[in-house]
């Protein structure tokens, strides 16, 4: 019975920590860049895009395809960084609770 109560307490702690982490992820910002800095995408670790910066040299009709490719690349770079920030927070939580890495998280 004590084991069950301990597990319930641990589950409640995990839920509380997860809620805290979700709030924190909204404040963590990462920036993805492409084209040597010609395009930058800033987003939160919750994957909310905050801003997109484009070098004026790319704002020409003949540069449209290049700009599109750079935007996709910068967004992908920012997404990977946001996912890494999320994983880091998750590992900090599961480590403190003595759970194995990746426990219950895709």
Curated annotation (Swiss-Prot):
Chief subcellular location: cytoplasm
Gene3D superfamilies: Nucleoid-associated protein YbaB-like domain
Pfam families the record matches: YbaB_DNA_bd (PF02575)
Top-level taxon: Bacteria
Keyword Cytoplasm: yes
Keywords from the named record: Cytoplasm, DNA-binding
Location in or out of the cell: Cytoplasm, Nucleoid
GO molecular function: DNA binding
GO cellular component: bacterial nucleoid; cytosol
Intrachain S-S bonds: none
Complexes and interactors: Homodimer.
Purpose: Binds to DNA and alters its conformation. May be involved in regulation of gene expression, nucleoid organization and DNA protection.
Sequence similarity: Belongs to the YbaB/EbfC family.
Name of the protein: Nucleoid-associated protein BRADO0764
Species in which this protein is naturally found: Bradyrhizobium sp. (strain ORS 278)
């Amino acid at each position: 019975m004590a084991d069950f109560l301990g597990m319930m307490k641990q589950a409640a702690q995990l839920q509380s920590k997860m809620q805290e982490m979700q709030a924190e992820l909204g404040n963590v910002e990462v920036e993805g860049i492409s084209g040597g800095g010609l395009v930058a995408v800033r987003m939160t670790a919750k994957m909310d895009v905050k801003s997109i910066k484009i070098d004026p040299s790319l704002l020409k009709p003949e540069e449209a395809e290049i700009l599109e490719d750079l935007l996709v690349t910068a967004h992908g770079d920012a997404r990977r960084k946001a996912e890494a920030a999320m994983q880091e927070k998750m590992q900090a939580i599961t480590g403190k609770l003595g759970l194995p890495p990746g426990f219950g998280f895709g």
